Regions:
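Bacterial N-terminal signal peptides
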Residues: 11-26
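Short, glycine-/small- and polar/acidic-enriched structural segments
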Residues: 31-167, 171-175, 182-189, 199-204, ...
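Predominant activation on well-ordered alpha-helical scaffold segments within soluble catalytic domains
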Residues: 49, 95, 152, 192, ...
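Pocket-lining segment of extracytoplasmic ligand-binding domains
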Residues: 92, 125, 170-261
Length: 325
């Protein structure tokens, strides 16, 4: 009887120890990390979504939910409202949010420059150079956007004035095809697809010429920065580890990217992979100069001169990206 009691006691102790061991892990896994994106098809975001497909977040003990919003502004609104913990956004817009009292910081670079961006015109357009667009209509997604900034920069470089027409991302290509605008400036997927299909040609490879303005960056809420630093660091580590995997495994990445980016040809998929992936930050490191350049340009493009006075080094931290000690 005494032996049986000892066995029961030992079993109870073992179960108790197992429970004590399991509880902290369960608590750590219970908190969901919500990561928001401007869309669910940009090649810039593919590593995060690939990590989800590969089960890498779960393997790291993280409960991550990826959310594709309708535009970066919607993602920012979600973070402001506490409906997202991390978002992918662009530097000047982060500064604008912070200037309005939102508590957030940039934590890891996705793409500092504008790789894949092009200024395109219809194939039958008489425009052969930027000078030919003087006084013409250029389609952009929205005001206070990256395309808005790019259009201003292009005009300044060419010494011309163009009329910017905010169309929404979904209307850019239809408006160009119907000649409602003379040109558009936008990111890789839309512009490359039109060029490869022979419906448009590029007057400027924006990605190769425009200076880095912190075009795409992970941004974390104050709660993540202060109260969930370990989870933030772990989530970013998974994303950048997946990026390294995708860079080292072209065949798998091409197959995944074709479906993710809704690419309609192997040629377009290859253009996205070869044109963008080598430029994606391998470790998330942030440079103050990238942010400062974006603030200066946005202050003019958006007619918000206060942005030029914001101290770039107050908007980010390199404490959490995978290369940080």
């Amino acid at each position: 009887m005494r032996k049986m009691s000892i066995l029961h006691a030992a079993g109870a102790l073992a179960r108790a120890m197992l429970l004590v061991t399991w509880l902290p892990l369960a608590a750590a896994q219970a908190a969901e990390i919500r990561i928001g994106f401007a869309n669910g098809s940009s090649a810039d975001y593919a590593p995060a979504f690939a990590a989800e497909k590969l089960g890498s977040f779960k393997q790291a003990g993280l409960d991550v939910r990826l959310i594709a919003f309708r535009g970066g502004a919607a993602a920012q609104e979600a973070l402001t409202a506490g409906a997202a913990d991390i978002i992918a956004y662009f530097g000047p817009a982060v500064a604008l949010a912070v200037s309005k009292g939102v508590k957030e910081k940039m934590v890891a670079t996705i793409l500092a420059g504008h790789s894949g961006w092009n200024l395109i015109v219809p194939t039958d357009s008489p425009a052969r150079s930027l000078k030919d667009l003087a006084g013409k209509k250029i389609g952009i997604s929205t005001k206070a956007s990256t395309s808005d900034m790019a259009a201003l920069w292009i005009g300044e470089q060419a010494g011309i004035s163009m009329t910017q027409i905010p169309l929404g991302a979904g209307a850019l290509i239809p408006s160009l095809r119907s000649h409602q605008v003379d040109a558009i400036v936008f990111s890789a997927l839309l512009t490359m697809r039109e060029m490869l299909a022979g419906r448009a040609r590029s007057l400027m490879d924006v990605g190769a010429t425009m200076p880095a303005t912190m075009a795409n960056v992970y941004v974390a809420s104050e709660d993540m920065l202060v109260n969930r630093a370990g989870e933030l660091r772990a989530a970013l580590a998974v994303i950048y580890k997946t990026l390294a995997y995708m860079k080292a495994n072209r065949a798998w990445s091409m197959s995944y990217l074709k479906d993710f980016a809704k690419s309609d040809s192997d040629e377009l998929t290859a253009a996205l992979y070869d044109g963008i992936f080598p430029k994606l930050s391998p470790d998330g490191h942030i440079e103050t100069a990238w942010i400062a350049e974006g603030l200066t340009l946005a202050a003019r493009a958006w007619e918000v001169p206060e942005l030029a006075k914001v101290k770039a080094d107050t908007l980010y931290t390199n404490e959490f990206h995978p290369a940080a000690p």
